[in-house]
């Protein structure tokens, strides 16, 4: 179960599938969150120069480290606020999106991720359905309408 990585030692390349998102906020639909962290750590432990993510531009290890650092930070920040009794909405509002992460697209995915983390932390304050997640995203002003002129912003040629 889960995602597949393709490691090509001779070329010092790893293909990450949906484990890595570069230039856009990553999203995890089901946990546990710790598996995502472990998968990123596994990728970064490989003897590679090139990481080909499932979403976004091709990067070196620094780009992969950036994503790993973000998902660890997001978990830690969500846990602090969960333990303090904050709501899902207030938690998302309070988490500082630092540079260069603040330039990433798909910021609305923070709600999905924090909601999953709230479920893992015990469930208090987590919403139950994707429709509920979308309502929180809309309430926080995180859902931007997509226009046809924006095209595909995930680095894939469809």
What are these regions (language model features)?
Residues 1-80:
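Metallo-beta-lactamase
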Residues 86-158:
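C-terminal regulatory/interaction regions
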């Amino acid at each position: 179960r889960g995602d597949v990585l393709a490691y090509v030692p001779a070329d010092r390349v790893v293909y990450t599938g949906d484990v890595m998102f570069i230039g856009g906020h990553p999203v995890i639909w089901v946990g546990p969150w710790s598996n995502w962290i472990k998968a990123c750590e596994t990728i970064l432990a490989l003897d590679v120069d090139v990481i080909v993510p499932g979403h976004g531009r091709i990067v070196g290890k620094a780009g992969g480290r950036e994503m790993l650092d973000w998902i660890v930070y997001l978990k830690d920040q969500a846990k602090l606020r969960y333990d303090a009794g904050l709501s899902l909405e207030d938690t998302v509002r309070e988490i500082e999106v630092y540079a260069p992460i603040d330039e990433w697209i798909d910021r609305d995915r923070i709600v999905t991720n924090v909601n999953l983390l709230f479920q893992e932390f015990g469930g208090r304050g987590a919403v139950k359905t994707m429709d509920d997640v979308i309502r929180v995203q809309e309430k926080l002003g995180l859902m931007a309408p997509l226009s046809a002129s924006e095209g595909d912003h995930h680095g894939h040629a469809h």
